[in-house]
A protein has these predicted regions:
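Extracellular calcium-associated, cysteine-rich motifs in secreted modular proteins
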Residues: 1-34
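Extracellular glycoprotein-like low-complexity segments
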Residues: 31-181
């Protein structure tokens, strides 16, 4: 592809895939697909090293991601959480080998620390998204309201990113933060 026509000149993408039809190719686009709706997120700091946890839940519109279960089984996925200042709060990466089909059209990925992400197909046609990150090392407990909202990005193979922010209402204690929309 000539440089003048390349939708992502900094990264090789011979197919020029552009799922959302904007000017950026999927491998350069920070938000390729819609449909992710995260409604809750929580963080808990443990006094023990490498024992912090965080979790998130919400839905994913199957109409915007009809092949997501097959894509995840074939290529894995990554989840990232950033605060409103775009600093990383936590992330999980699952290789294809750690993901399997569950239920009727769903998928579950589990890593060596027993962290999981589950996309459960529901009768309404959407997916219930459940994330449980275990044995993590959070640099510090996020401060609320200063760090809220939190952006959750679910990335599937070929760099398809789905983003949503959560944190309209947050509460905190000395060791935990909980936010919801």
């Amino acid at each position: 592809t000539s440089c003048a026509l390349d939708n992502c000149p900094a990264v090789a993408n011979p197919g020029q895939a552009n799922l959302d039809g904007d000017a950026e190719g999927d491998v350069c686009d920070a938000s390729d697909a819609t449909g992710l709706s995260i409604t809750k997120i929580s963080f808990r700091k443990s006094p023990k090293a490498a024992s912090d946890v965080w979790g998130a839940s919400g839905t994913l519109d199957a109409a915007t991601s009809p092949t997501i279960a097959a894509d995840v089984i074939a290529g894995g996925l990554t989840l990232a959480v950033k605060n409103q200042g775009a600093a990383s709060v936590g992330s999980l990466t699952f290789a294809a080998a750690s993901c399997k089909s569950v239920g009727k059209g769903g998928v579950k990925c589990t890593d060596a620390q027993k962290s999981t992400v589950k996309l459960s197909k529901r009768a309404a046609g959407d997916f219930r998204v459940t994330v449980s990150a275990r044995k993590q090392s959070l640099a510090s407990l996020p401060a609320v309201p200063a760090d809220a909202p939190f952006t959750v990005t679910l990335t599937t193979p070929t760099s398809i990113d789905r983003n949503d922010a959560v944190g309209a209402v947050c509460s905190s204690t000395a060791s935990a933060v909980k936010c919801k929309d």
